[in-house]
Regions:
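Membrane-interfacial terminal anchoring regions of lipid-handling membrane enzymes
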Residues: 1-511
Length: 511
């Protein structure tokens, strides 16, 4: 079950599996890809085409379930994309659970062989459809796949860099059900398979676990690392020496304090990675008497945001710690742990993160010490007195800036509008995010994406930071803590801008 970045995923994964000496899987593909001549090629490569929706067609659904069951009974592996479609933002999409539910229902037929799910992370230094994604995010309708599109793609072929394929920790469905639903075998019937009450919740939990394991196997590369650095800088540009220094910082951080042991980090040096990235002709190089400046063209900012989103979750905790250290200059281990404990559950919901490793914070801070950015004496932590140290921590801290601003909009509105209805909060938060984006030139699509905002509000409820009653939504004391943290972490001018917008909108709603 891979993530879905591009139509190239079909070929890359199948090709890799074949060259590992394994039997390529049957592939569930959207019916939109069944056109001449691609359809025949895909079908001969193992694809079977399915409709986007089975709603209202019980016969089609029943026939497909039987087909899927027969594949499993005969021991064939099956590949399907749990996101249901290609991500247009670079973030993992919320999982679609239909195929996974059918897989579990097939097990309830009494299949006498174990079934395992293998989560797969796929990443690229260039996604062929990226310009199409940007047009769709800008509001253009999605165009159907066609022969003309194939010829255009062939015509535009060039050095697209490297593709990355990482296998996450496999999940044994039998073992999962034994642990989570010990009585699942009582629902087994060879012909008359029903939907037991536990099926829906267990499918949802299993789907989330798959997504967590995909993101735990992310691949860092030259393009997404440079995007992480350049996008947070003014004019999206940085001198070559400073860029290399920050890149070295990130490489050391990920090698010594990786979010997961499945994450892959390039073996090359910072200079080699930059040289490779420049060969892809994605970055502008501006030379003057002081040296070279590496820049992202302003028109392509959204494009690079896609690549940054592939790996932003790997920097979530280090970025929050760096921002806290930059703002406070002095802190304690207890304060760092309290900060991460408050925000990590929110990050985990948004980016499909695994449970926090109790040693992760210590490893990140130790990496900062190794690079002479901070000093630790007992429980006390302070940053070293150098401009270079401040610049590196500030740059890393900025990686979470837009995420925290989005949080501040929602939390601020709840704090000033106690009793607001959930639907109104979702709508008003999107309006406020769009306004803030206009004022500050924020063009990142997910900043004001309603689905992302709705997901955050759901996360607040799950964490019991808000309660929903007949009188509307009410924030808890813990939500006040989040509010105060955000106020301390965000730049004063940004916070003031958010606060002004929230207060104005709240007053407008009352009137």
């Amino acid at each position: 079950m891979p993530c879905h970045r591009s139509h190239m995923d079909y070929l890359l994964l199948t090709y890799s599996i074949y060259h590992l000496g394994l039997v390529p899987p049957h592939i569930a593909a959207g019916i939109n890809l069944n056109f001449f001549p691609a359809g025949g090629v895909f079908r001969r490569s193992g694809a079977f085409f399915i409709r986007r929706s089975f709603a209202g067609n019980k016969l089609y659904s029943s026939v497909f379930k039987e087909y899927l069951s027969q594949l499993f009974i005969k021991g064939y592996s099956v590949k399907f994309y749990t996101e249901g479609g290609r991500s247009r933002t670079g973030r993992l999409l919320p999982p679609k659970t239909g195929m996974l539910a059918m897989t579990l229902q097939a097990m309830l037929r009494g299949i006498d062989r174990p079934i395992s799910i293998v989560p797969v992370y796929i990443g690229y230094e260039h996604v062929m459809e990226i310009n199409t994604y940007l047009k769709e995010l800008a509001g253009n309708d999605k165009k159907g796949e066609s022969v003309l599109g194939i010829f255009k793609a062939i015509k535009n072929l060039k050095n697209y860099g490297r593709g990355y394929l990482n296998f996450g920790d496999p999940i044994s469905i039998n073992q999962y059900l034994n642990e989570q639903q010990p009585d699942w075998r009582e629902s087994i019937h060879p012909t008359d398979v029903q939907k037991p009450q536990w099926l829906g919740p267990q499918v949802a939990n299993l789907a989330d676990k798959v997504m967590v394991n995909i993101n735990s196997a992310a691949a860092l590369n030259a393009v997404n690392l440079l995007a992480m650095i350049l996008l947070v800088n003014d004019k999206h540009a940085l001198s070559k020496p400073k860029l290399i220094a920050q890149l070295e910082f990130y490489l050391h951080l990920q090698r010594s304090a990786s979010y997961s042991d499945k994450v892959t980090t390039p073996n090359e040096s910072a200079e080699q990675l930059l040289e490779h990235a420049l060969k892809l002709n994605k970055f502008d190089v501006i030379s003057d008497e002081f040296g070279e400046i590496i820049a992202i063209n302003d028109k392509e900012k959204t494009l690079f945001n896609y690549y940054r989103n592939n790996v932003l979750h790997l920097f979530a905790v280090p970025s929050l710690l760096a921002l806290h250290l930059f703002k406070a200059h002095k802190t304690t281990m207890a304060d760092c742990q309290a900060l991460i404990a408050r925000f990590y559950p929110l990050f985990a919901k948004e980016w499909f993160l695994h449970e926090l490793d109790e040693n992760y914070i210590t490893r990140v801070l130790a990496s900062f010490v190794d690079q002479d950015l901070i000093e630790i004496e007992g429980d006390n932590i302070k940053i070293t007195n150098s401009n270079d140290c401040l610049a590196k921590l500030e740059m890393l801290g900025r990686a979470l800036s837009l995420t925290l601003q989005r949080y501040a909009i929602v939390v601020g509105f709840i704090q000033t509008s106690s009793g607001i209805e959930r639907e109104e909060l979702e709508h008003e938060s999107q309006v406020l995010a769009e306004r803030l984006g206009t004022l500050h030139g924020i063009k990142t699509p997910e900043f004001f994406d309603k689905k992302v905002l709705v997901g955050f509000i759901s996360s607040l409820r799950e964490q019991k930071l808000i309660t929903e009653t007949e009188q509307g939504l009410t924030g808890s004391n813990e939500l006040c803590e989040v509010y105060l943290y955000l106020k301390a972490l965000l730049p004063a001018r940004v916070w003031q801008s958010i606060d002004d917008i929230v207060q104005s909108q709240a007053q407008h709603a009352k009137d």
